Swiss-Prot record:
Cofactor(s) the protein needs: Zn(2+)
Binding site for Zn(2+): 117, 121, 230
Keyword Ribosomal protein: no
Metal-binding found in the keyword field: yes
Active-site residues from the entry: 120 (proton acceptor), 193
UniProt subcellular location: Mitochondrion intermembrane space; Mitochondrion matrix
Pfam family, one: PreP_C
GO cellular component, one term: mitochondrial matrix
Function field: Degrades mitochondrial transit peptides after their cleavage in the intermembrane space or in the matrix, and presequence peptides; clearance of these peptides is required to keep the presequence processing machinery running. Preferentially cleaves the N-terminal side of paired basic amino acid residues. Also degrades other unstructured peptides. May function as an ATP-dependent peptidase as opposed to a metalloendopeptidase.
SUPFAM superfamilies: LuxS/MPP-like metallohydrolase
Gene encoding the protein: cym1
Organism whose genome encodes this protein: Aspergillus fumigatus (strain ATCC MYA-4609 / CBS 101355 / FGSC A1100 / Af293) (Neosartorya fumigata)
Name used for this protein in its record: Presequence protease, mitochondrial
UniProt lineage: Eukaryota, Fungi, Dikarya, Ascomycota, Pezizomycotina
Listed EC numbers: 3.4.24.-
Amino acid sequence: MLRSFSGAGKCKCRIPVSRQPVCGRSLRISSTLTPWNQSRRAASTVTSLDSFPNVGEKLHGFTVQEKKHVPELHLTAVRLKHDKTDADYLHVAREDKNNVFGIGFKTNPPDATGVPHILEHTTLCGSEKYPIRDPFFKMLPRSLSNFMNAFTSADHTTYPFATTNRQDFQNLLSVYLDATLHPLLKEEDFRQEGWRLGPEDPRSILTQGEQSKGNLQSEDVVFKGVVYNEMKGQISDANYLYYIKYRESICPSLNNSGGDPQYITDLTHQQLVDFSKRNYHPSNAKILTYGDMPLSVHLKQIGEVLDGFEKGQADTDVKLPLDLSRGPLNVTVPGPIDTFASEDKQYKTSTSWYMGDTTDVVETFSVGILSSLLLDGYGSPMYRALIEGGLGSSFTPNTGLDSSGRVPIFSVGLTGVSEADAPKVKSTIKRVFEESLSSGFNDEKVQGFLHQLELALRHKTANFGIGVMEKTLSSWFNGSNPMKELSWNEVIDEFKKKYEQGGYLESLMQKYLMNDNCLTFTMVGTPSYNKDLDDQEMVRKEKKLSELVERHGSVEQAVSALAEEELQLLKIQEEAQNADLSCLPSLRVEDISREKERKPVRESKMDDIDVVWREAPTNGLTYFQALNSFEELPDDLRLLLPLFNDCIMRLGTGDKTMEQWEDLIKLKTGGITTSTLHTSSPTELGKFREGLQFSGYALDNNIPDMLQILTTLVTETDFTSPHAPAMIQELLRMTTNGALDAVAGSGHRYALNAAAAGLSRSFWVQEQQSGLAQLQATANLLRDAESSPERLAELIDKLRLIQSFAISKGSGLRVRMVCEPSSASQNEIVLQKWLAGLPRNRSPTSPLDHTSVNSVANRVFYDLPYKVYYSGLAMQTVPFIDPSSAPLSVLSQLLTHKYLHPEIREKGGAYGAGASNGPIKGFFAFTSYRDPNPVNSLKVFQNSGIFARDRAWSDRELAEAKLGIFQGLDAPMSVDEEGARYFMSGVTHEMDQRWREQVLDVTAKDVNEVAQKFLVEGSRQSICLLGEKKDWADSDDWEVRKLSMNASGEPVIDPLSQDGAVASA
């Protein structure tokens, strides 16, 4: 998996968005040192410093270098080095049963062929101890892990997992260590995962006979490979493309680790093997373990593997960015057109400065605060000057402080900029610097950020260990001490000391930003960009074919040879599906408890409002959630709910600007959110609730303030202020700008939502709230608002109407509180008072109109400028309490691992494919992701029912499917999520317990029967594809649609009509 383009350790771009108000063989002990007495461990707690060996002591071939207790994070960290290989090791002990392992290697890419990324994939395709094909994916259903992945970052590659089961941990540890240190790296795996040339549909050769190979033409040959198609998908995301081209410009010595499709096809198998030998060695590794398992157990198992190696050469080369000390640099590159932006605003431009050295942990923390002060929130000076000032529509993806490398880089930029305004962006940024330096920074804002850090330390998350790994690895690989990264209080205290002396943040600004030593990077939307990529790919293909023709003598023989290679790969893939997997370790279904852990809640009534309480250890925090559901909401108002949520966190009230509200939110809360609500009934198919939900958390004593802030923002946001119309248009631009990139990142989900919209009104409503229909409606709103003051006024009137009933006392309101038992009584008093002050208004209603659902086409193709495809197929099934629900979930796991993965990913080259059962929503789904051949994938989807019905499922296969379900079902839960399932959907503990038992008791016969009933006989199916339209989309009854500011032909709701009528955009 390619690491997110923002990079580990990256302070992500702080774009003010809706619902976001703020923003690791034998025991060898030297006789000259005191052996570590393991018996001391048994009498101590997990994090007691005395329970760990002292500095200089040895254990299982490792020597302790540092150890430290970090009370604010309730952990103890021990840093060790493996004596024989010099492998670095960090153990983080914490009272957390969700244990984590990670091993990473420094992998500076030598070029842009993506060798680190392709190696990450092929490393997981078989090893010496586990010589089966693809043990990584084979382990997914043999484990109860709640996190299992691999990441290629800019300069290192990491293989992490997390699980609460200790035997599972040791199983996965064995597989991960052997995969990374003893990979097979077979050439056929390189061809499957990396790249190859071959006939687009080799299955046709099998169906038409061997003689058909001679009929293949050069046009039938295409580039294939999982990573190749993944990266084609990545560059379809203009945000990713902008970021990666920016990184190539500012740090040209650090090549594209993910791989540029233009260069991936230059990589050879031998180059991959050589890169692995150089880099995947313990001497070049960083290892991290986290959790409550004993350190000695880890060291024994890991040490036995590392002792099989001799000391090698570590890659300590830290790639540095360009030298900017001689003055400014400017780089301009072409990019794709954003069809959701105006034709005259196709520029993306940013300017970047260096901010010191990340090994200075305190200063890096301090410049992070400085970055937040300049960029966070609607009231930030950069937002006001750049976006509110009308120069662009949103921040560029590199905006913020990037501390993933040795040199922190601070960038500010805008998308949706006109050619004339592009030069003004930098000058405006510099003006903001000058004004901020002159006026200084408001102490209240700094205290607000520090308060947020205090709450972050108190907040108990389920994935804390993975967060520790992500926080430490990037800087560790670039020379920082990970122990310092974990010392939160020391860093904060040192910052406070410097800050209290006065002028500290301003001095950092003067030191790093008040100069012209910067790089300005600009991407210009070019109409021919995507066609140019296609042409370049064709040239590369012709060059490869010419080389093959020289070798084979003719085009026909060259293409026939490629077909033969493809058939050989297909044969290997087919054989792998029936391989003996007995060498792989596995948990058993018997390891799963039949009893669901009970998280008791209590219910009360206050003023006729249902309140659900969950009392649990929360470190002095109280979490609040309220749902306000609306019955039969008019369609035109529904489409405006997301925009209403945006407005609540943007417009401000009569007596306070949004900047003032943001400061108060940071000082008094951990954040408040508003969002749309859509939940399904577990007992009745198609029954659902929609509306708005509100949530937040704060220290117990700040809950009254938090509730007051929330209520005031919802009920008193000033839609009538002179600034409101411009702000609303600004919000619409932010949503539409980059909408295509948002879809590309989760294209399979958007395709599935659009497909499901034709199944029932519930799914149709969901699509209107959060799917492609919502994106197009938003674009239409922007178009109308910019062209017609009258339409903008109508929009504001409807937003004010929503405000009148958004949060009100009535049958639709429900509340959930999570707090310490000792805080419950005081919170009851506070809540009672808050409820008493709410207005009592009902939402307007309209008769249910099912024509909108019935008119949705069963086969929809969205013509979008992507180089790969995303597909979704949906069918309605049964509610959660139906006996068929559990076997349908087992069926989805079986199809994913035993049919769809080998057919669509391994053979078809898609990055991903799977089946899923939505037990609460009552639908069964198929999806593919970054898929080069969606037509074939749809055939596989449609053949799945017969495959599952006719297969004699083994006990082992059933057990694996059940383990896969319980990975999610029994995954650790953050304290604020406890009780949420019952509160949101009405799923009781007894319902969950019954479903759990039904899953555990599913038989092969049950699976065959639900496959026949729902997939073969089945009810109505709906399909949606996203991607570049090809000739085949003109047939097969596809309804072709577009998404853009000027889309036409698809039926959309007009949110500004009087009755929410369906119209043509």
